[in-house]
């Protein structure tokens, strides 16, 4: 019997939706995007109106083949990726691959069976079933907006990154939004470095009234005019003038102040509060929210989507959800906390789709306490945050009684020194009973001036207990943390909240910034971050301009609304980009060849030192060094690092000079492959080093995937060789997920070839049956037979001259004694013979590799021209 084929992005989402749709549908997962611009090559024809060359993403061929197979027997195809630009693009690519032919997939007239788009903002039975009653066509304005963003990012990534490779260092990347975000951090650091602190003083008077409590009032002016205390001399003069002064209440102002609840979460507000309140990175918070949206097992209820879609700019709330939350407030908190009408909020974002809702619980009746047993710790924290914010948004305002008291101290010659104190008392909790929005430190500056006050009246005399002068210094603007960076990006209109997690991860992973340890860790630009930012901003002024980047974001919104053509937006961008790119190619400084004169002398020969650039940053070298002259001076030394660049890194217990614990010589800061560290100046005689824990270790991220060995959840972890996936049950369970490339081992025939990382950081390929099978290859094996020596496989080697297929039996770089050894047949023990006989049937189906003397085959074939594979950022 034919069924409807439903395609979503993830297996977790598929599992939840399958339960709601029943046996009449097959729900399958595409595992995210199935098509993209080619990994190598630009993939965009800028001369032909930005025509694109999309291809199936390598590794997704089996997924696409399986979906095609299922589509052939389905009576209808329902495309149900997420309700946003990315989801619409996934749906469009699925439609193209599953048989829609006319207009590049933009209509389905030649498709014999209906191909329909289905969207829902929450994964609940009611929402899903209702969505399937009202399917629609693909929204090509949304697809065009996504494609425009993708092309913009590809153009910048592929054409600017090579400039950095050529002028600074290979492996660096530039991104249309990534670089602008980095610019914010770098410019803030420059602002901090330029900041000159200014001295100022405060003066508080501790006073008694007829009744307690004692309170403090602060000096604000003289004879009714505002005045500041600039130094200690002025402070002491005021203290002398106030000796014997009469203290009187000049005025008392009382007012009732209301504090309104905040709207339910948008994506950016959620990211900020998760960072401030929960100490979560933006990336982690979004991953946890994704799991809550796609579905969590709730015992007998089965899999349930607990929150609405978490990528939204809207604060709208549906009528059913409003009815439900008002019912809960009246029942659990009382009618006094329930407004007569629902609170209505206006969306600030210009292009927020009102079809979307704010982030809220799918059912507010599922309280955090009721679901706590089924959630992981971070899931519960995020769910509770969203639940509390939503409930509070529909409650009454909090009410405060605020009293402001002006006090005069009448001194000699009737000079009146003015003091002020503000008292604030919570009269009615309102929404604060459930939730209070987190604030930046600067938002709380005035809180210290609010006190509980005794009964006071104008004309009342007061008694002075003491005067408390205190010295202060103005402070520079604070460095960005994740929450404040997200806030700044949103306020400037740079990027979209859904991309902020990727942007932040990229600038950290590329080594452009470091993040100090602990909750609310601050971003500090590294030396390479400063260099890259200054080069790009100086030479590509338009492209990495704040206003231009924000304007391009507005253009993308207009493409989505159908107000402008996507190609027009690209032409506007590319006109400026092409000019800037040409200018940068001619005028960008080549840091690799930099030799800046300094006033320092060589410690070996006395010649002047010059500042040069190496793979680990800048360093000093003797100006007489000559590569061609083996007798020239080779003296070099580290460029001392400004300690402020390391922020909160612990240099030593008192930030004074540190000495080696082994030899007593001074320790200095150095840079290496893995970052900044302390090293003894007695090197090479003394090799003492000490790590700096200035960078926060990335937290383990739970994945929606089970361990095949023990059934526990898998975790995305970070080790010394990069990210890897392993079991959360470690050390009891030592399962590590291997990176299969989809090829059987050509040596043993039973194992799979996996990509591995060596201690030195380079990749190689080996059999996953190691140590039973010791097959390895220095380059990626390909399931092709060598036409010359009939080797069972070839290898794909990428060089600066292009991509080549080479025979493993040819003498190639990286294949020395070890490579020869791997080709030798192993000696058979009795146990191995026995094992082999048991697997004979399985092995017969796999052709045995043809083993010939290494170096005896010369087969090589060029299959691709050299391409710059820039490390672009999807912004």
Where is each model-derived feature located?
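C-terminal or mid-to-C-terminal helical accessory/interaction module adjacent to the motor/catalytic core
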Residues: 123-205, 255
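Basic, low-complexity terminal or inter-domain segments flanking catalytic cores
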Residues: 2-5, 16, 161, 194, ...
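Intrinsically disordered, low-complexity regulatory segments
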Residues: 1-150, 220-221, 229, 236, ...
């Amino acid at each position: 019997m034919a069924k409807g084929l439903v395609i979503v992005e993830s297996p977790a989402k598929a599992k939840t939706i399958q339960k709601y749709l029943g046996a009449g549908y097959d729900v399958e997962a595409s595992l995210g995007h199935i098509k993209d611009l080619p990994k190598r090559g630009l993939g965009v024809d800028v001369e032909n109106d930005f025509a694109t060359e999309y291809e199936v993403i390598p590794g997704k061929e089996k997924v696409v083949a399986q979906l095609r197979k299922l589509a052939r027997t389905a009576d209808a195809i329902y495309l149900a990726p997420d309700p946003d630009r990315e989801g619409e693009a996934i749906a469009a690519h699925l439609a193209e691959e599953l048989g829609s032919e006319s207009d590049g997939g933009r209509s389905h007239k030649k498709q014999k069976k209906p191909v329909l788009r289905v969207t829902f903002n929450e994964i609940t039975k009611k929402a899903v079933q209702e969505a399937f009653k009202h399917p629609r066509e693909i929204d090509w304005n949304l697809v065009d907006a996504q494609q425009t963003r993708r092309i913009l990012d590809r153009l910048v990534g592929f054409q600017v990154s090579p400039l950095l490779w050529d002028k600074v260092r290979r492996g660096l990347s530039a991104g249309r939004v990534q670089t602008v975000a980095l610019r914010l951090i770098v410019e803030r650091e420059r602002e901090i470095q330029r900041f000159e602190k200014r001295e100022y003083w405060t003066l508080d008077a501790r006073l008694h009234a007829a009744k307690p409590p004692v309170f403090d009032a602060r000096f604000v002016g003289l004879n009714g005019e505002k005045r500041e205390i600039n130094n200690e001399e002025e402070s002491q003069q005021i203290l002398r003038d106030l000796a014997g002064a009469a203290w009187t209440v000049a005025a008392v102002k009382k007012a009732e102040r209301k504090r309104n609840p905040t709207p339910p979460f948008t994506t950016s507000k959620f990211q900020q509060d998760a960072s401030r309140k929960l100490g979560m990175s933006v990336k982690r918070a979004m991953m946890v929210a994704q799991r809550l949206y796609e579905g969590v097992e709730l015992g007998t209820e089965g899999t349930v989507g607990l929150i609405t879609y978490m990528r939204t700019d809207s604060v709208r709330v549906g009528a059913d959800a409003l009815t439900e939350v008002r019912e809960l407030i009246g029942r659990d908190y009382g009618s006094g906390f329930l407004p007569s009408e629902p609170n209505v909020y206006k969306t600030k974002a210009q292009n927020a789709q009102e079809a979307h809702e704010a982030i809220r619980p799918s059912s507010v009746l599922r309280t955090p306490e009721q679901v706590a047993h089924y959630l992981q710790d971070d899931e519960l924290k995020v769910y509770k945050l969203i639940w509390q914010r939503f409930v509070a948004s529909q409650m009454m305002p909090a009410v405060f009684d605020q009293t402001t008291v002006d006090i005069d101290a009448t001194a000699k010659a009737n000079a009146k020194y003015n003091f002020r104190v503000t008292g604030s008392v919570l009269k009615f909790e309102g929404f604060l009973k459930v939730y209070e929005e987190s604030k930046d430190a600067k938002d709380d500056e005035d809180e210290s001036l609010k006190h509980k006050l005794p009964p006071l009246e104008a004309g009342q005399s007061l008694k002075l207990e003491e005067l408390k002068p205190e010295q202060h210094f103005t402070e520079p603007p604070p460095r960005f943390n994740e929450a404040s960076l997200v806030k700044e990006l949103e306020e400037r209109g740079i990027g979209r909240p859904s991309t902020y997690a990727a942007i932040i991860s990229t600038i950290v992973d590329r080594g452009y910034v470091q993040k100090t340890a602990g909750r609310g860790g601050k971003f500090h630009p590294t030396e390479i971050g400063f260099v890259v930012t200054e080069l790009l901003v100086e030479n590509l002024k338009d492209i990495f301009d704040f206003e231009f980047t924000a304007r391009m974001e507005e253009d993308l919104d207009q493409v989505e609304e159908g107000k402008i053509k996507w190609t027009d937006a690209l032409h506007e961008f590319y006109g400026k980009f092409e000019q800037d790119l040409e200018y940068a190619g001619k005028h960008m400084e080549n840091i690799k060849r930099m030799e800046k004169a300094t006033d320092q002398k060589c410690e070996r020969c006395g010649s002047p030192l010059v500042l040069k650039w190496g793979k680990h940053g800048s360093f000093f070298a003797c100006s007489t060094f000559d590569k061609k002259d083996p007798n020239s001076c080779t003296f070099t030394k580290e460029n001392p690092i400004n300690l402020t660049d390391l922020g909160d890194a612990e240099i030593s217990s008192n930030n004074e000079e540190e000495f080696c614990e082994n030899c007593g010589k001074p320790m200095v800061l150095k840079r290496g492959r893995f970052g900044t560290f302390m090293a003894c100046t007695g090197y090479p005689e003394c090799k003492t080093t000490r790590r700096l824990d200035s960078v926060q270790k990335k937290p383990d991220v739970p994945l929606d995937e089970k361990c095949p060995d023990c059934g526990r959840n898998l975790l995305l972890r970070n080790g010394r060789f990069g990210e890897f996936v392993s079991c959360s049950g470690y050390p009891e369970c030592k399962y590590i997920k291997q990176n299969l490339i989809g090829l059987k081992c050509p040596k043993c025939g039973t194992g799979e070839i996996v990509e591995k990382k060596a201690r030195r950081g380079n990749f190689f390929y080996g059999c996953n049956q190691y140590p039973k099978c010791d097959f390895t290859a220095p380059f990626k094996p390909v399931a092709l037979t060598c036409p010359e020596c009939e080797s069972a496989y070839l290898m794909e080697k990428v060089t600066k001259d292009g991509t080549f297929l080479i025979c493993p039996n040819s003498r190639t770089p990286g294949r020395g004694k070890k490579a020869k050894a791997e080709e030798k047949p192993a000696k058979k023990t009795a146990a191995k013979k026995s094992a082999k006989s048991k697997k004979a049937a399985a092995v017969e189906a796999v052709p045995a590799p043809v083993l010939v003397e290494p170096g005896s085959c010369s087969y090589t074939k060029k299959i691709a021209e050299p391409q710059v594979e820039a490390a672009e950022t999807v912004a």
